């Protein structure tokens, strides 16, 4: 909004001219989302505690230490969604189609997550909305997003770029739409599975969003994209502002979500954040890089898949003491804080490997 209001005055005012730069607006987005989180956090937490007498239901078959979390309110993802959306609407170019498509997916998946959290709180169990129903809704929203991207682009690309190799890509044709839906839905649920300990998912999400802030900026810049031999996609640079806002809102949320957590982001936060990372990776044509930068989410999801299939195949045997993987280490006797910090370190390594693919070809 500010960008669009100040755009006619960029040549007459030094302050207005600053808003012409994506980097300036991105830095401002971090400051605004952090500030909004610090201000609204205590108010929202108090409100959620009033509404949720018992807080988020805790699994009885989980680590015993988790029973101390009983009574902690959920739906804290509302804080992240509101601060990110407000900063984006304030600072991004509102004539940019990618901003609106991404926000549509972000809010829609947040609504699905809210429905799930609401069902858990009202029914006082950790099951919530049926898994098949959630997947169906996620698939429909992802399909709408893919159709919007397909038919608002004059020359839609169905290429899947392979990182670390020069000019190596696969032409998926219209199957790319199916693949894109898989990326968005998969990313959403992968983040959801990772969000099982205080602060565990928040920092990796921030690292991934920060990585895609850089990727969006480079891909949307003709000079940098040509230099790095990346697919140039006009107007994606504005997504840098949105990604920066996500970084700030996640760090602001971490202030209240660090152990012992005052609030959980719930499915409201995890499903929406996972989806927006998937959407941005599809827009920037860095879907495979997302699986590297967000490698921690892939590892956590893989541990669940392996556990389920092995359990069924062996009629009751398990690979891990408990899945997702972070619970396995808790069952091994690791303190929650140690699991979280070590997983953060791993997420940094994944992010660096993913970003190195931009240059190493």
Swiss-Prot record:
Pathway: Cell wall biogenesis; peptidoglycan biosynthesis. The chain crosses the membrane at residues 28-48, 74-94, 99-119, 133-153, 168-188, 203-223, 236-256, 263-283, 288-308, 338-358. One of its GO terms (biological process) is cell division. Its cofactor is Mg(2+). Pfam families: Glycos_transf_4, MraY_sig1. It is an enzyme of class 2 (transferase). Keywords: Cell cycle, Cell division, Cell inner membrane, Cell membrane, Cell shape, Cell wall biogenesis/degradation, Magnesium, Membrane, Metal-binding, Peptidoglycan synthesis, Transferase, Transmembrane, Transmembrane helix. GO terms for cellular component: plasma membrane. Coiled coil: none annotated. Catalyzes the initial step of the lipid cycle reactions in the biosynthesis of the cell wall peptidoglycan: transfers peptidoglycan precursor phospho-MurNAc-pentapeptide from UDP-MurNAc-pentapeptide onto the lipid carrier undecaprenyl phosphate, yielding undecaprenyl-pyrophosphoryl-MurNAc-pentapeptide, known as lipid I. This is Phospho-N-acetylmuramoyl-pentapeptide-transferase. It comes from Rickettsia canadensis (strain McKiel).
């Amino acid at each position: 909004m500010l960008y669009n209001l100040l755009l006619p005055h960029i040549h007459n005012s030094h302050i207005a001219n600053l808003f012409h730069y994506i980097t300036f607006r991105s830095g401002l987005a971090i400051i605004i989302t952090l500030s909004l989180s610090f201000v609204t956090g205590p108010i929202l937490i108090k409100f959620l505690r009033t509404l949720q007498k018992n807080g988020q239901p805790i699994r009885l078959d989980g680590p015993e230490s988790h029973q101390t979390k009983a009574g902690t309110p959920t739906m804290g993802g509302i804080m992240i969604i509101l601060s990110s959306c407000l900063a984006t609407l304030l600072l991004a170019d509102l004539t940019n189609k990618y901003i609106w498509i991404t926000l549509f997916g972000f809010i829609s998946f947040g609504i699905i997550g809210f429905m799930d959290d609401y069902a858990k709180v009202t029914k006082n169990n950790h099951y919530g909305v049926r898994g098949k129903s959630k997947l169906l809704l996620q698939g429909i929203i992802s399909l709408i997003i893919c159709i919007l991207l397909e038919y608002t682009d004059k020359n839609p690309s169905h290429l899947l770029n392979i990182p670390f190799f020069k000019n190596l890509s696969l032409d998926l044709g219209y199957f790319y739409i199916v693949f894109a839906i898989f990326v968005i839905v998969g990313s959403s649920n992968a983040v959801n599975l990772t969000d099982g300990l205080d602060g565990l998912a928040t920092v990796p999400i921030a690292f991934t969003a920060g990585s895609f802030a850089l990727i969006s900026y480079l891909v949307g810049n003709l000079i940098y994209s040509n230099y790095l031999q990346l697919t140039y996609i006009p107007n994606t640079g504005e997504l840098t502002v949105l990604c920066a806002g996500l970084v700030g809102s996640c760090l602001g949320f971490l202030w209240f979500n660090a152990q012992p957590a005052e609030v959980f982001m719930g499915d409201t936060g995890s499903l929406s954040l996972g989806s927006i990372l998937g959407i941005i990776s599809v827009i920037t044509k860095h879907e495979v890089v997302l699986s590297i930068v967000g490698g921690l989410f892939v590892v956590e999801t893989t541990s669940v898949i392996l556990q389920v299939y092995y359990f069924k195949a062996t009629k009751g045997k398990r690979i891990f003491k408990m899945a997702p993987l972070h619970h396995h280490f808790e069952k091994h006797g690791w303190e929650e804080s140690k699991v979280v910090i070590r997983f953060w370190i791993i997420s940094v390594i994944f992010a660096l490997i993913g970003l190195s693919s931009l240059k190493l070809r």
